[in-house]
């Protein structure tokens, strides 16, 4: 009989694994050192360094308690790092109303931010290199136009060596290479003539430099004060030299020394600080750094002396050129015209855009920002030529310049919106927006409200408010506090009787009814009657109260509650609603809850309306603990309700009879009017008692 574990029967015996074969097995066993039941971060144990791998029954020097402490410290350190990262997240990225951000999301945001920083650094390096090359090209163009080819080649070679050495360092290592254009050679040869268009206008240079602003982020370096001071000194020396050259040329023309002027044009004028006209050509080694302005001015001064048939008057007129730059008269040769760039450096044309573009997007602000910021109040400095004069002298460039201005303004606005350096300006605009909204809401509250018409002395501020609202659109803060102070003073003056009555009354609805009111002496209610009202409310027998009858008569006759001055102007009508208050009882032990009409409280507020949105001088209210008695001893509410209903019915009947008599043309008797007033007074008293009983029954 064949055994069961035989290969011939198809039942091959499974291989049996032993611990000695565990080293070559592909299956993990408990004896392997790679198996670890702790967390993945603690795969290495300090016991592994002392005991051999695979040794059985090793005694661990690390007890479970210390392991838990180590794990807790590691988790605390990780949580602390995550908390630090979460505090670095800007507030605008916080999810409103969702609590804290998850830890994984914090780590993901940190990874994305680091990647963004790496790409941004590479972009800045590329932008810096391109800006450096553009500056080299502009310097080469300028030096070539003033016939300084040797100095131009040496300067370009030195600048190229400098940038090569700078980008070879560890800070600027990059795999990308930036090649110079083929038409500009830094080592040998002169720049190609086709690459250099004539510099007939400063605006061409401004357009070229401003178009590169959106690709370069290093233009803000011009805000350095030391660099700006250096440019100020350079410009002052250039303008002084130009003024001296123009004066010398004018003296030479006035003296009639035509050979000297011809020599000054045929030969190259020495570019010195004194600006003197000599006959020797300038040496490249002796050219100072501030010689460009004097050279251009001297060329402009003597540019017209070569023309045939020129007299002394024409020569004198040709020397009148702006020493600070600008275009020469039309008779100047093209070479002299090419030598008249504006004295403001090209790099400074980008700095004013950063200060002006965020206030307004109009072309006016963009044009005003083109004025150089380096001019100071000195005797030798003059303002640059205006844009209109330049466009008059070059009318064929007006349309192209307008198109360039619109494109540049759009680009600068887009650049400003994406820039992180003007975040404080955005916050400033947000504050202005809030104040602008406040002004508009105040204006709408005062003018467009149908039920709350504004008094005449308040309507006078409408134009001032509108001007402030328009002025706030320009980025300036509106001054609202003086307006509110003025309104409060007027209200206090009206409450004290210092303003006449006709100032506050409205002429639209001041017809015969107002005249009748003035003819009839209406009863008034004073502050001295409050104690009597408290006593009568406490006694509870105010059905025959003369004080409440007086109050109801005031309400029936249409009179107003007067302040002690008794000259308060009538206030405009308002919506009728009740205000819950707590009135101190006559005994002074507890408060009684009451509902008082808001119109009854207005005369006691010194002319201030608590419902206005512009009311900012709210009185300081301190919380206090009061005892409220909701169930005092009083007549039953049912009896008061019945009395009030009866009084209201009698009043309505009397009113209907009065209407019928008025329609029939019958004169109303004084008895009927008195009865009607008495009925209304009784109804008011009953209603007041009913409200008091209901409030006390709460």
UniProtKB/Swiss-Prot annotation:
GO process terms (BP): circadian regulation of gene expression; circadian rhythm; dendrite morphogenesis; negative regulation of transcription by RNA polymerase II; regulation of circadian rhythm; regulation of DNA-templated transcription; regulation of neurogenesis
Protein localization: Nucleus
Pfam families: Hairy_orange, HLH
Record-linked CDD domains: bHLH-O_Cwo_like
Domain of life: Eukaryota
Organismal lineage: Eukaryota, Metazoa, Ecdysozoa, Arthropoda, Hexapoda
Region listing for Helix-loop-helix motif, in residue ranges: 76-117
Domain Orange: 128-159
Stretches for region Basic motif: 62-75
Note: The name 'clockwork orange' is based on the Anthony Burgess novel of the same name and derives from the potential clock function and the presence of an Orange domain.
Keywords: Biological rhythms, DNA-binding, Nucleus, Repressor, Transcription, Transcription regulation
Protein name, per record: Transcription factor cwo
Keyword Cell inner membrane (UniProt): no
Bias type Low complexity, positions: 280-318
Region annotated Disordered, chain positions: 257-319, 349-369
Tissues with expression: Expressed in adult brain where it is detected in the dorsal lateral neurons, small and large ventral lateral neurons and dorsal neurons 1, 2 and 3 (at protein level). Expressed at constant levels in a 12 hour light / 12 hour day cycle (at protein level). Strongly expressed in pacemaker neurons. In adults, mRNA expression oscillates in a circadian manner with a peak at around 14 hour Zeitgeber time.
Compositional bias of kind Basic and acidic residues: 359-369
Molecular function terms from GO: DNA-binding transcription factor activity; protein dimerization activity; RNA polymerase II cis-regulatory region sequence-specific DNA binding
GO cellular component, one term: nucleus
């Amino acid at each position: 009989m064949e055994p069961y574990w035989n290969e011939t029967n198809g039942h091959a015996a499974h291989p049996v694994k032993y611990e000695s074969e565990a080293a070559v097995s592909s299956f993990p066993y408990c004896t392997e050192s790679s198996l670890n039941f702790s967390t993945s971060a603690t795969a290495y144990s300090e016991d592994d360094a002392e005991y051999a791998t695979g040794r059985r029954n090793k005694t661990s020097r690390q007890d479970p308690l210390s392991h838990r402490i180590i794990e807790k410290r590691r988790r605390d350190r990780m949580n602390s790092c995550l908390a630090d990262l979460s505090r670095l997240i800007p507030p605008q990225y916080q999810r409103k109303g969702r609590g804290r951000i998850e830890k994984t999301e914090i780590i993901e945001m940190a990874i994305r931010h680091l990647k963004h920083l790496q790409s941004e650094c590479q972009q800045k390096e590329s932008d810096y290199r391109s800006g450096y090359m553009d500056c080299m090209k502009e310097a080469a163009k300028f030096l070539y136009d003033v016939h300084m080819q040797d100095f131009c080649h040496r300067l370009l070679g030195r600048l190229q060596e400098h940038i090569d050495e700078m980008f070879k360092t560890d800070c600027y290592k990059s795999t990308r290479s930036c090649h110079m254009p083929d038409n500009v050679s830094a080592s040998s040869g002169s720049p190609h003539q086709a690459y250099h268009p004539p510099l007939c206008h400063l605006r061409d240079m401004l357009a070229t430099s401003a178009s590169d602003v959106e690709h370069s982020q290093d233009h803000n370096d011009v805000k350095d004060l030391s660099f700006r001071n250096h440019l100020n000194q350079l410009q002052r020396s250039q303008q002084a030299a130009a003024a001296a050259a123009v004066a010398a040329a004018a003296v030479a023309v006035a003296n009639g020394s035509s050979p000297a002027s011809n020599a000054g044009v045929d030969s190259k004028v020495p570019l010195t600080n004194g600006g003197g006209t000599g006959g020797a050509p300038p040496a490249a080694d002796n050219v100072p750094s501030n010689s460009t302005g004097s050279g251009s001015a001297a060329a402009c001064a003597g540019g017209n002396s070569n023309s045939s048939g020129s007299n002394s008057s024409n020569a004198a007129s040709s020397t009148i050129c702006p020493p600070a730059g600008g275009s020469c008269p039309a008779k100047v040769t093209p070479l002299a015209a090419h030598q008249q760039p504006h004295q403001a450096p090209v790099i400074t044309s980008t700095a004013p855009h950063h200060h002006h573009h965020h206030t307004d997007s109009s072309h006016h602000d963009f044009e005003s920002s083109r004025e150089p910021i380096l001019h100071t109040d000195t005797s030798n400095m003059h303002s640059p030529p205006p844009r209109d004069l330049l466009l008059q002298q070059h009318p064929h460039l007006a349309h192209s310049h307008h198109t360039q201005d619109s494109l540049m303004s759009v680009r600068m606005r887009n650049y400003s919106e994406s820039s992180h350096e003007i975040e404080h300006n955005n916050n400033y605009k947000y504050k202005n927006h809030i104040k602008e909204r406040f002004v508009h809401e105040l204006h709408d509250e005062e003018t467009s409200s149908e039920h709350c018409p504004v008094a005449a002395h308040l309507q006078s501020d409408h134009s001032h408010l509108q001007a402030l609202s328009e002025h706030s659109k320009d980025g300036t803060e509106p001054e609202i506090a003086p307006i509110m102070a003025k309104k409060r003073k007027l209200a206090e003056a009206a409450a004290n009787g210092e303003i006449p009555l006709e100032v506050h009354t409205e002429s639209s609805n001041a017809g015969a009814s107002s005249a009748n009111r003035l003819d009839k002496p209406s009863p008034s209610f004073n502050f001295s009657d409050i104690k009597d009202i408290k006593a009568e409310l406490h006694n509870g027998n105010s059905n025959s109260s003369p004080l409440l009858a007086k109050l109801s008569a005031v309400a029936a006759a249409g009179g107003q509650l007067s302040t002690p001055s008794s000259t308060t102007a009538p206030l405009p009508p308002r919506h009728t609603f009740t205000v819950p208050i707590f009135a101190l009882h006559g005994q002074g032990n507890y408060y009684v809850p009451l509902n008082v009409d808001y119109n009854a409280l207005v005369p006691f507020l010194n002319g201030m309306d608590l419902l206005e949105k512009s009311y900012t001088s709210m009185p300081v209210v301190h919380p206090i603990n009061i005892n409220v008695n909701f169930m005092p001893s009083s007549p039953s509410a049912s009896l008061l309700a019945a009395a009030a209903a009866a009084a209201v019915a009698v009043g309505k009947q009397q009113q209907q009879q009065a209407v019928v008599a008025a329609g029939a043309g019958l004169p109303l008797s004084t008895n009927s009017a008195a009865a009607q007033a008495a009925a209304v007074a009784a109804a008011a008293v009953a209603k007041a008692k009913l409200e008091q009983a209901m409030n006390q029954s709460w």
